[in-house]
Amino acid sequence: MKEPLAAWLDRDSLDALWLRVLRRPIEPHEREETEARLAAGLSRTRLLRELVESAEFEHALRLDDAVAWAAAQRRAGERPRNVEAPPGTDERPVEIPWCLARYGGEQRVLDVGYAFAEPAYLVGLLDLGAPELVGVDLARADVPGLESVQADLRALPFGDGEFGVAFAISTLEHVGRDNAQYGLAREDDDGSLDAALRELRRVSARLLVTVPTGEGEALPEQAVLGPEEWVERFERAGFIVFEDELYELTDAGWRSVPQLSPGLRYGERGPGASAVLCAELRPRSLGERLRLAVRDLRHGNEVRRVTGSDAPK
């Protein structure tokens, strides 16, 4: 009994507390402030209560719930649509489970933009149980259980078809843009997005992707494209859109919609995107077209697309 109690009083207990409750390391200024409060009489139980009642914990809880739900859907063989999330949240509780649930047991998995990913999402990736999990990013980050590769999406250091599936969660919109907020270079190259998509088509058999969408001019740090514009980019890079779904942040929360509200702009309704496009992309080939035709023949009554000529009218 003495060892657990000693660990609770140990200075390192703050590291464990932040990791378990908030899913991130404690920042130096937080440690300094918290140690001062503990010295002034704050109990560790009171500290735990404060963390659990924080908005940051609520965000982590929503993501953990979403990742756990996606795992259950995946085990049941479901490809969920109509995912929902409450008002006041960003797009993560919708886009992350949408993609994770569609993992199909591939041996080699690539994640694009892992360095700044949500901890709950990284846990979800590790929980896929893929024999080989690789993360690629311009920035460097160490994630236990994931092979880290520092590289440019426009020139990936991988062989053709090396990965069974790639994940790109709210990442592609930043390619070729001003990424100084992430400690990276300032750029403004619209052609970079096409180059990154071509590389992802080259190295992976499937791409599970999410992108914020809406109207308005491009932001310094990201592209702003409407749903059909995104699909045009995907197809121009040599993909076919196997499945897609649009989500919009409404008064009731995040909901699946057949089309976006007119004039919808990034960031006007919540802390992140006002709408997000989730899609499964596959390299354009005769085999994929045949698989798509068979799928539509067998499941023609199920909605598969909300964009393109085969979307329901």
Residue ranges and their predicted role:
Residues 191, 209-233:
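Acceptor-substrate binding/catalytic loop of class I
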Residues 128, 141-143, 228, 232, ...:
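A C-terminal cap/extension of S-adenosyl-L-methionine-dependent methyltransferases
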Residues 62-106:
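Class I SAM-dependent methyltransferase Rossmann-like catalytic core
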Residues 167, 176:
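A conserved beta-strand element that flanks and buttresses the S-adenosyl-L-methionine
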Residues 169-172, 210:
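Residues lining the SAM
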Residues 1-62:
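Substrate/cofactor-recognition hotspot
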